[in-house]
Amino acid sequence: MKKSGRITHRIGVALAAFALFGLTATIASATPSTQVWIPSTDIQPYKTVHLNFDSYIRTGKEPASNVGYFGIPDGGNLAPLYSVGPTVGVLPFEKIKAEVGFDLLYGGANTPAGLDKYPLYGNFKIGMPEDNTWIPAVAVGMYGIGTKSGNVNNGVYTKTGTNANIYYGLVAKNLPVVGRLSLGWYGLNKEASVAGVYDRNGSEGDDNGLLASWDRTLSEISDKLWVAIDYQGGKNAYGATSFGASWAFAKNVSVLIGYDIYNNKDRAGQNTATIQVDINFP
């Protein structure tokens, strides 16, 4: 995966809220060790401090139906979303590892929704690494742990909230030649406007879904080149198919360039290009 082993990162970008009652859409998330978009089973080593600097840039203008929903002018683009934050390995054991972290998120739909005032999102993960037998890597955790509680009434977000509080479980296994395959499930708090479970018409989407990914270091070309494709299911602001490639410029520094295709643009907005810079200390 992009972090850990190499370098690891993750940001879940969440959009949504409601134009009714003056509530505009929002964008939010937090970042454990990830693939391009979804969490991975990678966990930061003990005392390793990982810093991520991520940007998500919209590649198209929002359709007229999304203008009020996201609080932007007719025919406008959502502003880029920026995320920065640390993740730290906290357990000294070989067979069980854990990491904790937080992110500060600014821009995107958070700005018109007034949620730049609540930029802090937490994350944590605990799991077991893969061994050299048949036993896969296993990880469970949470991300997108926001500080502002939202509320929904009859399908309408009556109060914006950043507390998506996404919980998940994953298993992963490396296969010769093929690379690593990961599979899991997630759930979230549908009352958080950033989760976008309800659309502007009050139609309910999904508050849980599939997680799946493939990633591989392309050592045939260079040990510095890593690629991945991942999928987060569900009709909400987080559902997306993403792909990207990362280059390790140093032992502890990598840069990923990727693209996110959202499952439901009424809830998540237009697709995004992403640039993610990851640095490990020491």
What are these regions (language model features)?
Residues 23, 89-93, 174, 236, ...:
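A short, compositionally biased micro-patch
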Residues 192-195, 239, 267-268:
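A short, polar/proline- and glycine-enriched secondary-structure boundary/capping micro-motif
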Residues 182-234:
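A mid-sequence, solvent-exposed acidic-amphipathic segment
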Residues 205, 217, 231-248, 252, ...:
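Contiguous ligand/interfacial binding patches
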Residues 29-167, 175-177, 188-189, 215-225, ...:
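Transmembrane beta-barrel domains of Gram-negative outer membranes and organellar outer membranes
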Residues 1-35, 282:
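Cleavable N-terminal export/targeting peptides
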